[in-house]
């Protein structure tokens, strides 16, 4: 349960199209507000980690060609990607450059996006992926990525990722619980050297969708996307 939830107004008790402007009677004023999780406290991160563990493990039962990967960024590639980051403007039209941990995550995001663009150019479609960022703890402390890539063209992973070193799981091995636990631990990992850093997840849509459909469809008439 979230440690620092925010209370927002319950739309059920506001005039809207669904109720045609007829607000239901309120028997208990406490229902006028609903708690929304902050998504940043340790309890929220633990829940997010557990949710992804289930989705990734169940997904690996249906799709067998997943590979555990690590992507790194060299100093040179970080400098180049930093120069290519977009410049944002604030309300006063002043240009703002990202810095600190926001810059690190933006560099990783741009690197992955360009990796996917190159992959689509070669294979005519994107590659299924789930990646999470982490900061190094020795030497340069450069940002890097751990995660999963689903493909039968694992030899192209290293060829297309040209920002630094890559490590790809051996072809004969499958995704298992220990691998999933390893990559999802970064969601709620306590990083004492970078206490303010929040990792980001970069992933394809629909991971775990087959599990959700098989689990929920017997109980409802809706489909999941």
Residue ranges and their predicted role:
Residues 1-141, 151-225:
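Right-hand nucleic-acid polymerase module
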């Amino acid at each position: 349960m979230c440690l620092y939830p925010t209370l927002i107004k319950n739309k059920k008790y506001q005039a809207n199209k669904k109720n045609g402007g007829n607000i239901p009677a309120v028997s208990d004023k406490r229902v006028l507000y609903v708690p929304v999780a902050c998504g940043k406290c340790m309890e929220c991160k633990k829940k997010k980690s557990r949710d992804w563990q289930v989705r990734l493990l169940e997904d690996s039962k249906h799709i067998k060609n997943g590979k555990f990967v690590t992507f790194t960024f060299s100093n040179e590639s970080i400098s180049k990607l930093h120069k290519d980051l977009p410049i944002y403007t604030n309300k006063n039209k002043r240009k703002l450059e990202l810095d600190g941990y926001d810059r690190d995550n933006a560099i990783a995001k741009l690197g992955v996006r360009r990796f996917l663009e190159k992959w689509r150019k070669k294979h005519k479609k994107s590659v299924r992926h789930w990646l999470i960022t982490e900061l190094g703890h020795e030497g340069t402390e450069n940002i890097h990525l751990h995660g999963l890539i689903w493909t039968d063209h694992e030899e192209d992973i290293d060829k297309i990722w040209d920002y630094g070193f890559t490590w790809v799981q051996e072809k004969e091995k499958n995704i298992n619980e220990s691998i999933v636990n390893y990559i999802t631990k970064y969601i709620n990992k306590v990083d004492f050297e970078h206490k303010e850093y929040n990792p980001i997840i970069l992933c394809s849509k629909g991971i775990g969708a087959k599990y959700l459909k098989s689990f929920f469809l017997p109980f409802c008439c809706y489909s999941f996307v």
